[in-house]
Regions:
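C-terminal amphipathic/interface module of NAD(P)-dependent oxidoreductases
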Residues: 226-256
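A generic structural signal for short coil/turn motifs at secondary-structure boundaries
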Residues: 50, 224-227
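Terminal hydrophobic/aromatic helix or amphipathic segment near a protein terminus
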Residues: 162, 172-194, 251, 256
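C-terminal helical subdomain
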Residues: 23, 133, 157, 182-222, ...
Length: 256
């Protein structure tokens, strides 16, 4: 990255979103090194086909895609507040609009949040678990944006488009068929550079400096599934996420 950009001020912090101790350690290291944070882009994600649990006992799709950004962002909120104006950008997925594994047959089936089975313990379906975690990102974005109004921190979410990354390895496609699938899908996929454009826009555009609590697709505001706007469900999801990440609810009063 240093060679490609010519910018020597690039730092790397080890961080495993499937390990809450690793997230806490990364946040502590950041606070030790820096006193300001103006942009936080929560971009990492994974589609885990097998019903695996993290060392914390959390279903992997939920842990990496939702609880990871949730915990990291909460741990960095104090610094974001003191650095305002600041921006939080959360990368979601179009899977929130259609949680089916095969999307070109029949009607779309929007993702849903099941508070009684957030970890997909009753019946694990990889795409449904992934879509639920991505919907949780969007709902958490709306909830946090509303509570940070007036602080100088904006919070937005986005779908980057279908991007040519290694995430397809987690879609349950048999390994011998992966090369064929990759070649066949390449004409329909955006490059990683193009896929990053909306996140960069939300992180840097002066025109979006005051925009918050929005969901963007291909650089423009878009509607997310109707259930995502339910404030009671957002609050219940936030509380459940605090429990799963061992965050004290009282922390809200300290950081909001």
């Amino acid at each position: 990255m240093v060679a490609g950009t010519g910018n020597p001020r690039v730092e790397v912090l080890p961080l495993d979103l499937a390990d809450q101790d690793s997230i806490r350690s990364a946040a502590a290291q950041f606070h030790h090194r820096h006193h300001a944070l103006h942009v936080l882009v929560n971009n990492a994600g994974a589609h885990i086909a097998a019903g695996r649990l993290t060392g914390d006992g959390i279903e992997m799709n939920l842990a990496v895609n939702h609880l990871g950004w949730f915990l990291l962002t909460n741990l960095l909120l104090d610094t974001l507040r003191s650095s305002a104006p600041a921006r939080i950008v959360n990368v979601a997925s179009q899977a929130i609009a259609d949680a089916r594994a095969i999307t070109w047959l029949g009607r779309p089936r929007p993702a849903r949040i099941d508070l009684d089975d957030l970890q997909s313990e009753r019946a694990f379906h990889p795409m449904a678990a992934y879509a639920q975690a991505k919907l949780a990102i969007v709902m958490g974005t709306y909830h946090l944006a509303r509570h940070l109004e007036g602080t100088g921190i904006t919070v937005n979410a986005l779908h980057p488009g279908l991007v040519a990354t290694g995430i397809v390895r987690g879609f349950g496609i048999p390994r011998p068929l992966l090369p064929l699938f990759t070649r066949a899908s390449r004409p329909f996929l955006a490059t990683p550079e193009d896929g990053a454009s909306t996140a960069i826009q939300l992180a840097t555009s002066p025109d979006l400096a005051a925009v918050t609590g929005q969901y963007f697709v291909r650089g423009k505001p878009a509607r997310s599934p109707e259930a995502s706007y339910n404030r009671d469900l957002q609050e219940a999801l936030w509380t459940a996420s605090e429990h799963l990440t061992r965050l004290a609810p009282g922390r809200r009063q300290e950081t909001w």
